[in-house]
Structures are given as C-alpha cells and as structure tokens.
Amino acid sequence: AFWKKKGKKHVIHDVSMTAYDGEILGIVGESGCGKSTLCKTILGLHNNYTGTVKMDDNLRPQMVFQGPFSSLNPARKIGWILEEPLRLRGITDRDKRRQMVADMLVDVGLDPSFADRRPRELSGGQRQRISIGTALLMDSRLIIADEPVSALDVSVRAQVLNLMRELKEKLNLTYIFISHDLSVVHHICDRVAVMYLGRIVEIASKQQLYSNPVHPYTKALLSAIPIPDPELKRERIIIQGDVPSPANPPSGCHFHKRCPYVRPECSDVI
C-alpha cells in the first residue's frame, strides 16, 4: 500500500511468491496490473509504502530496466559507467576495476574497446548488454529484469535473451523476469506468475501453465498468443467488461466482475 494525499492506496494485494535459486521466474499481466511496482518495491525503490519484503542479504538484487536508451548516463563513457558499481563496492584499485570491466564486457559479448565509447554510439541491444553487465558488477545473484527486450528490435531480442540464460548458467543467477509478451516468457522462464490488479492469480511451472492453465484470466491471456502457422486456428477467449481501477479494485476476487464463472460468494472471498 502507498500513502497518497487522499489516504492509503493498496496497489499490491497479499502477494507471496518464492524465486528459487538458479531459476527464471516470469511475472506476466497487462499494463497497470502491478508487475513493475512489485519488483521496484522488492528493490526498495518505493519508500512510501507499507508491507514486508523478506530476502536473503547475499542476493544483492539489481534491476535491468526496460529502456536501454534512458538507463545509461549519456555524459559518461561505458568504462566509467561499468566502474561505478565497483567503486560502490569499495574497490579502489583502478587497474583492477578496469580489468574487471574488460572481463565483464567479454562476458556480455562485447569487445573490451567498448569501454571507450559513449552510450549514444551503441545500439539498443549493446546498451542492454551494458545494463546487464552493470548489474552483475554489483556481484548480484538476483536480477530483476523489467521488460528487458520490449524496446529492442525483434532480431536482437533472441540474442539478449540467450545471453541472459547463458549468464544464468555460468554465474548461477536467479532472475525475476517481467513481461507482457507471453511468447518471450515461454522461451526463457522456468516458472510463471500471472498478475491481475495487484494479485497473483496463478503461478505454475512453464509447462503446466501453458498446457493446462487453471484461472480464466490466464486462459484468456494464452488464447491471445499469435500462432505463426496461418492454417492453425485458436479460439480466442474475449473477457467482457473494462478493467477496474487499480486504485479501487472490486472486493473479494478482483476478477469476479469479468469472470464467466462468477458466483455470489466471489464478491466477498478470494
């Protein structure tokens, strides 16, 4: 809940989830459902809130933001940007920092000479690789990726996703991967949580969720995934009604006003 001028507004409701060591946990849902708010709260980027976040101190979580064009300082060279987390970690030896930066550039698939470039000289995919490297130089074991490929060209997305998976295997990382693109989530995630109006309505392994979804909202989301074969047909599930305001969601189950299986008790209990 966040405190506003008109009082306390609940944005995230009774969310409880576990990201297991070495897995990629996806969080999906339509815009405004609370995905980014949840993850920024985990990182402590929202100060004016109530609630509790419990986390292993050794994880040192870091975030990879959606926009690689706005998350890097345009006035600094890439080497300085990548050295910043090392300075924050107290590594004072300049030569050691530069060597660590060079090694990280190689790890994210870039030449060490990129350290002398500025963000404007890099493509979107290259900038996102730098963002990932910056997070890793903080010695993070939990990376929260907020729509990390949505701003990239389609041809570059697979390269960045494959890099993230390779780094996960190499460094034993854990990811929380936020996306509205269910095809991307299916490609990279191990488990998937579905959010609707600040609540997680379903969480399951990727295989189980995509093959046998339980919640009607999840079924509707999956029915909207495009099928590349024009000969194949999929029945679209159209959800009736408008999305309620996240600041004033319905009582009980937040989905009950749009649910085809609604019962009288749904307005009172979850």
Where are the regions a protein language model picked out?
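The feature captures the beta-strand-to-loop junction immediately N-terminal to the Walker
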Residues: V28-E30
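Helix-to-loop junction immediately C-terminal to a conserved catalytic motif
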Residues: L43
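Conserved ABC ATPase "signature" region
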Residues: K96-S113, L222-S223
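Conserved ABC ATPase signature
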Residues: R118-L122, Q126
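A short, proline-enriched helix->beta-strand linker immediately N-terminal to the Walker B motif
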Residues: L137-R141
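P-loop NTP-binding/switch modules centered on Walker-like glycine-rich loops
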Residues: P148, L152, V156-E235
